[in-house]
Amino acid sequence: MKPIDQKIYLASKSPRRRELLRQVGVEFELLLLRENSARGPDVPELVQPGEAPLAYVERVTREKAETASATMLSRRLRVRPVLTADTTVTLDGRILGKPEGDAEALEMLRLLSGRTHQVLTSVALKHLDDFWQVTHTSDVTFATLTEETMRAYSALPEPYDKAGGYAIQGRAAQFIKHIAGSHSGIMGLPLYETTQLLQQAGIRTL
């Protein structure tokens, strides 16, 4: 059996996922959907009727992996394992996606203020017919925020490409009272689970 390539494709437009992979020394190349594009393969991130948060995040991640792998083959790129991930924030079973404007960002902060919510990040690795997937859930507790604080934060650019409308590695770090889980997972790539996944596939991380 031919040894697996130790360099992977990362099919994600998230700069945070790139930083996290570099942190643990994983060699990767970005897999872009189009030439000169910073976007990863497009997969509609629409919640299906009655779909639970866990089922949603795992389905979207799997579809991203399938799309990215097909892109690699159609473009006749060197065959390598493809890594994808998706993060979703949920409160009381409700999925909080990426806010589309000030009003939606403010409403999300009001929901999260003083409450504990869950951040689910699913990671998938696809190599031809082989497929591995893992999902990590973290509990995040927000402090009780003043209306002034929430309005000030929702007016910043920071919330608008983040699930749940906040960035734990940004100014929203000051809102976080307690975390039970993976800090890197909340950022978008749980490093322990990701490296375990890579090792299962035969990719060395040290």
Residue ranges and their predicted role:
Residues 2-6, 48-206:
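Anionic-ligand binding patches
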Residues 13, 33, 128:
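Cofactor-binding loop segments of dinucleotide-utilizing enzymes, especially the Rossmann-like FAD-
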Residues 28-38:
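A short beta-strand-loop structural module common to alpha/beta enzyme folds
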Residues 16, 36-38, 131:
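Surface-exposed, flexible loop/turn segments at secondary-structure boundaries
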Residues 17-18, 30, 183:
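Internal amphipathic alpha-helical segments of the cytochrome P450 catalytic fold
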Residues 2-26:
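N-terminal beta1-alpha1 ligand-phosphate binding loop
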Residues 38-46:
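Short, charged, surface-exposed secondary-structure boundary motifs
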